[in-house]
Curated annotation (Swiss-Prot):
Lineage: Bacteria, Fusobacteriati, Fusobacteriota, Fusobacteriia, Fusobacteriales
InterPro entries, per database record: Cys-tRNA-ligase, Cys-tRNA-synt_Ia_DALR, Cys-tRNA/MSH_ligase, CysS_C, Rossmann-like_a/b/a_fold, tRNA-synt_1_cat_dom, tRNAsynth_Ia_anticodon-bd
Enzyme's top EC category: ligase
Keyword NADP: no
Family to which this protein belongs: Belongs to the class-I aminoacyl-tRNA synthetase family.
Location in the cell: Cytoplasm
GO biological process: cysteinyl-tRNA aminoacylation
Subunit details: Monomer.
Name of the protein: Cysteine--tRNA ligase
């Protein structure tokens, strides 16, 4: 049974998707006015892992993550550079895919809508809110009237309207009826992109964008809505309010929010100037190391970014890979031990169950990784004893396949498992041996012997068997 910490209820809820064996999930994507930083990469990596795990457990996952390609930050960026907002969006969407390809996000089957491609869907929801009395037009702007949703507003962020009112600043322009009201549609201004609407030319507010895109691709009610902690209020609170009032569904059933990545003890953010771009980190650390670093902490807990932490993660990944390479390097033709590896098999089954148990408990990747390292330790112990039987080798191979599947397919951490001998890859050696076999079949003994002797000079000894040629160091 999978349990999810639901921000809406404030506790762990049993996960029961709306449709049997199918999960609908929407995660707020980036506003594409700059390159993404490591803090932006955290939700991308985590929710990609949620998707992978749910698929591993047999669910079909409909996963939507948007691009916000029109808002104040993008307009400011375009004006500063004296280019179109479309040019800014295209540049940074391209950069987003360049950067995230290194952290192995699963793009297959992914839906990535752009806000500007869904303006009509936004207008439809806004019109519904106006018709139902939850929104009003003022000088070409349209606002959601928060007090009309007094009983529901603040449910997600655990705030009440009275407290929000006391903390709200007084609006100078007096266009809004109340300081708490938020924009659904903004009247056109010079040097800003605009679209036709029943209220005149203008552009959408930020919050309505996600409501429209989640509705278009997942419906009025769906399973999981994800994003960073900083989005709970006002973004997600406003999303939920306008969607419930305008569309009539329950909107998201489970709300998941990841914690911040801090740098020098402060939340990483572009607005504060305290951030490190993902593409800059990728100059020094591989994307798979960054991905494992993110998964090494529970998603709701804050993380501290540092080179020290990344170097430790790199060492941990190398420990896994070195163990798996040891299995690949086994001299399989000379396995003569008596250990059937039943103890290792029992450990594998135990760790397999514990991995699922950890992931079922609110996707605890940190704990799940701990169980993986326990299994890696058990494998090394078995290999160190060097007493494996032929039957034991089958167990070793089963453990190998399981570890590769869990780490690469479920956690999404790519492994480098090519064995190298004196900087020559195992695959290259096999190719050379294939060429030698061809030479022998053609009775080109001189070439066959030359390949054998040259490999020996490199420290690689080959042995011709009846049906197969093997090699060892």
């Amino acid at each position: 049974m999978i349990k999810i910490y639901n921000t809406l209820t404030g506790h762990l809820d049993e996960f029961k998707p709306l449709k049997e064996n199918e999960v609908s999930m929407y995660v707020c994507g980036p506003t594409v006015y700059n390159y993404i930083h490591i803090g932006n990469a955290r939700p991308a990596i985590f929710f990609d892992t949620v998707r992978r795990y749910l698929e591993y457990r047999g669910y079909k996952v409909n996963y939507v993550q948007n691009f916000t390609d029109v808002d104040d930050k993008m307009i400011n960026k375009a004006n500063i550079e004296n280019v179109s907002i479309k040019e800014i969006a295209e540049r940074y969407i391209k950069a987003y895919f360049e950067d995230t390809s290194k952290i192995n996000l699963k793009e297959e089957g992914m839906i990535r809508p752009k806000a500007t491609e869904n303006i009509n869907e936004m207008i439809e929801i806004i019109q519904s809110l106006v018709d139902k009395g939850y929104a009003y037009e003022s000088n070409g702007d349209v606002y959601f009237e928060v007090k009309k949703y007094r009983d529901g507003y603040g449910e997600l962020s655990k705030q009440n309207i009275e407290d929000l009112e006391s903390g709200a600043r007084i609006d100078v322009n007096e266009i809004k009826r109340d300081a708490l009201d938020f924009a659904l549609w903004k009247a056109s201004k010079p040097n800003e992109p605009s679209w036709d609407s029943p209220w005149g030319k203008g552009r959408p507010g930020w919050h309505i964008e996600c409501s429209a895109m989640s509705r278009k691709y997942l419906g009025d009610s769906f399973d999981i809505h994800g994003g960073g902690l900083d989005l709970i209020f006002p973004h997600h609170e406003n999303e939920m309010a306008q969607s419930k009032c305008g569309c009539g569904g329950t909107f998201a059933k489970y709300w998941m929010h990841n914690g911040y990545i801090n740098i020098n003890g402060e939340k990483m953010s572009k607005s504060s100037g305290s951030f490190v771009l993902l593409r800059d980190i990728l100059k020094y650390f591989e994307g798979r190391v960054i991905r494992l670093f993110v998964l090494g902490s529970h998603y709701r807990k804050p993380m501290e970014f540092s080179d020290t932490e990344l170097n430790q993660t790199k060492s941990s990944l190398e420990r896994i890979e070195n163990t798996l390479k040891r299995i690949k390097e086994l001299d399989r033709e000379n396995i003569k031990g008596i250990d059937d590896c039943q103890e290792l098999l029992a450990t594998k089954k135990e760790m397999e169950a514990k991995f699922i148990e950890a992931m079922n408990e609110d996707f605890n990747t940190a704990q799940a990784l701990g169980h993986i390292f326990e299994l890696v330790k058990a494998v090394n112990k078995t290999l160190d004893e060097a007493n494996i039987s032929k039957k034991g080798l089958e167990v070793i191979d089963e453990v190998y396949s399981y570890l590769v599947m869990i780490i690469q397919d479920v956690l999404g951490v790519q492994l480098k498992l090519e064995v190298e001998v004196n900087n020559i890859s195992a695959d290259l050696i096999e190719l050379i041996l294939e060429l030698r076999r061809n030479a022998r079949e053609e009775k080109n003994w001189a070439l066959s012997d030359k390949i054998r002797d040259r490999l020996l000079e490199l420290g690689i000894k080959i042995k011709d068997g009846k049906d197969k040629t093997t090699w060892t160091m």
